[in-house]
């Protein structure tokens, strides 16, 4: 086996779950805020359109721009219902907020013209546009805020589907993890020691030059949170490593043939070079030292957690796994912001702790 394959194992690419955005009325019915606010908006719109029609049918003067404001409000209500049915509210939050802000300006302007105008039939129209203005203001507060804001979390707590995931928190966690990974470079001293002992001490600048206190050392900071500690190597570097491996093996064989008295010493050099890369286990590699791809028994996953909302793994991080909302996961470590977990299909990796909730305490190790 070549050195490069031991240093940089090929990780499994996490599968990304396809989000279902088909038309479902239950997406709308499952959100009490959507049902209540849109229902009130429809009632207010009917009052406004009824009062406007009755007022315009008489000799009373009626502001013509109000008609466009009423039609525009109807389009906003229909769009909101479609966004909820297709579960696309989070994808169009900016569009929804700006559109409702325009409707708020239209309705407040119409309310000013109708309240101070003469005619009893304009009272119903003014009441309708005032109610629409209030509802629009509430919508701006909700859709303009992030899902992690206190108001949105309180409102979403009444929803059957639970609290919506926050794109802001998700991006901050991923940026923090990338920063931690980039500030903890790893250098395998066994590679340098084997080259030096074999007589081919060549300066190699492929990795950051730092000297840990002993061989086969991995920074504890890099292991915190199961960070990815494997170095970045190119194809040219891998070719260079394979060439050095052949030269080392040739030198070791020559020493064994010419000097039988040092046979034990040469054997130790070769064995140390092969086994230290796998941390004493020839069936694992550097990536598997983290325990993410090895076969682990059920007894090690002593916690159970329930997913509060779905999560899509990052393509740039091979250790993350995706999961669906309300999915039950087995967890083996609950310290830090990222937990090691396993899905029901056997997929193992790390998950963000703020996306799940523990539902069971530690199980007995021997049952």
From Swiss-Prot:
> Which parts of the sequence lie on the Extracellular side of the lipid bilayer?
54-65, 115-122
**Intracellular or extracellular location(s):** Cell membrane; Bud; Bud neck; Cell projection
Cytoplasmic side, ranges: 1-32, 87-93, 144-367
GO cellular component terms, semicolon-separated: cell projection; cellular bud neck; plasma membrane
The protein's matches in SUPFAM superfamilies, at most eight in alphabetical order, are given as: SH3-domain
At which residues is glycosylation annotated? Answer: 59
Which one GO biological process term can you cite for this protein? regulation of actin filament polymerization
Q: Which domain of life is it from?
A: Eukaryota
Write the record's keywords in alphabetical order, separated by commas: Cell membrane, Cell projection, Glycoprotein, Membrane, Phosphoprotein, SH3 domain, Stress response, Transmembrane, Transmembrane helix
Q: Which residues form the SH3 domain?
A: 300-361
Q: Where is this region: Disordered?
A: 252-276
Question: Which residue spans traverse the membrane?
Answer: 33-53, 66-86, 94-114, 123-143
Q: Which residues form a coiled coil?
A: none
In the record, the note on similarity to other proteins reads:
Belongs to the SHO1 family.
PANTHER family attached here?
Answer: FCH AND DOUBLE SH3 DOMAINS PROTEIN, HIGH OSMOLARITY SIGNALING PROTEIN SHO1
What's its job?
Plasma membrane osmosensor that activates the high osmolarity glycerol (HOG) MAPK signaling pathway in response to high osmolarity. Detects changes in external osmolarity and activates PBS2 through the stimulation of STE11 and targets PBS2 to the plasma membrane. PBS2 activation leads to changes in glycerol production that helps to balance the intracellular and external osmotic pressures. Activates also HOG1 in response to heat stress and mediates resistance to oxidative stress. Involved in the regulation of the mating pathway. May be a receptor that feeds into the pseudohyphal growth pathway.
User: What is the name of the protein in this document?
Assistant: High osmolarity signaling protein SHO1
């Amino acid at each position: 086996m070549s050195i490069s394959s031991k240093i940089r194992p090929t990780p499994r690419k996490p599968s990304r779950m396809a989000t279902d955005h088909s038309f479902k009325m239950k997406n709308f019915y499952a959100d009490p805020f959507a049902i209540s606010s849109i229902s009130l908006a429809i009632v207010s719109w009917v009052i406004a359109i009824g009062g406007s029609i009755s007022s315009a049918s008489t000799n009373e003067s009626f502001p013509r721009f109000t008609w466009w404001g009423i039609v525009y409000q109807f389009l906003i209500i229909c769009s909101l219902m479609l966004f909820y049915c297709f579960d696309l509210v989070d994808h169009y939050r900016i569009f929804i907020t700006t559109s409702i802000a325009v409707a708020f300006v239209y309705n407040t302007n119409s309310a000013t013209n109708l309240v101070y105008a003469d005619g009893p039939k304009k009272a119903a129209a003014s009441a309708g546009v005032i109610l629409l203005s209030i509802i629009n203001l509430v919508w701006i507060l909700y859709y303009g805020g992030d899902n992690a804001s206190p108001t949105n979390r309180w409102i979403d707590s009444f929803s059957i589907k639970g609290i919506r995931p926050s794109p802001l928190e998700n991006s901050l966690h991923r940026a923090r993890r990338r920063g931690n990974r980039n500030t903890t470079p790893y250098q395998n001293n066994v590679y340098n020691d084997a080259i030096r002992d074999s007589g081919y001490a060549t300066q190699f600048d492929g990795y950051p030059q730092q000297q840990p206190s002993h061989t086969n050392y991995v920074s504890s900071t890099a292991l915190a949170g199961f960070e990815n500690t494997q170095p970045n190597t190119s194809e040219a570097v891998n070719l260079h490593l394979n060439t050095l491996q052949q030269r080392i093996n040739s030198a070791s064989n020559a020493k064994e043939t010419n000097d039988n008295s040092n046979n034990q010493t040469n054997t130790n050099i070769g064995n140390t070079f092969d086994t230290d890369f796998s941390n004493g286990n020839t069936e694992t590699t550097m990536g598997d030292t983290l325990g993410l791809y090895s076969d682990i028994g059920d007894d090690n996953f002593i916690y159970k957690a329930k997913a509060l909302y779905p999560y899509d793994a990052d393509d740039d991080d091979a250790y993350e796994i995706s999961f669906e909302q309300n999915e039950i996961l087995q967890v083996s470590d609950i310290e830090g912001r990222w937990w090691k977990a396993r899905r029901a299909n056997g997929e193992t990796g790390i998950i963000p702790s703020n996306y799940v909730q523990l539902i069971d305490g530690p199980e007995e190790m021997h049952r």
